[in-house]
Amino acid sequence: AVAREGFGMDVHIFDPYLAPDKVPSGMTLHPSLESLLGLADYISVSVPLTASTRGLIGAAQFACCKKTAVLINSARGGVVDEAALYAALAEGRLFGAACDVFEQEPPTAENPLFSLPRFIGSLHIGANTEEALIRVGRTVASDVLAVLNGREPRFPYGQ
């Protein structure tokens, strides 16, 4: 929503578990990941690493992307197949990519992605700021108090 309002973007999403009536206002839900990838200028990956999401974005998915698309992976290492990402970038099938998560963390200087001019890599440290740690502590404490007082927590485990 922030991107849509701040940058004038159309926001399209794919979520196999999201009911159509629960789609946030102003967003378009796609029936498949591939249909979304074929339209996207910027692809932001935001999923946990599970058995079903490991390698979620691989060679077949990159084949669906526009050659002008940019991939942003700040989810978890292993969700994007790095060998397939390297091939897509090196062969010009994807314009660019930025990742702050890698299959091997921390990434080594020998990671071939770092040799590509249209790849930006950084460490996944966004949650390690003092402000983020304080916010997490407050959120956990608030949810514990909610449960102790017979209310639903704001962030129940597993949801």
Protein language model regions, located:
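Rossmann-like dinucleotide-binding domain for NAD(H)/NADP(H)
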Residues: 68-159
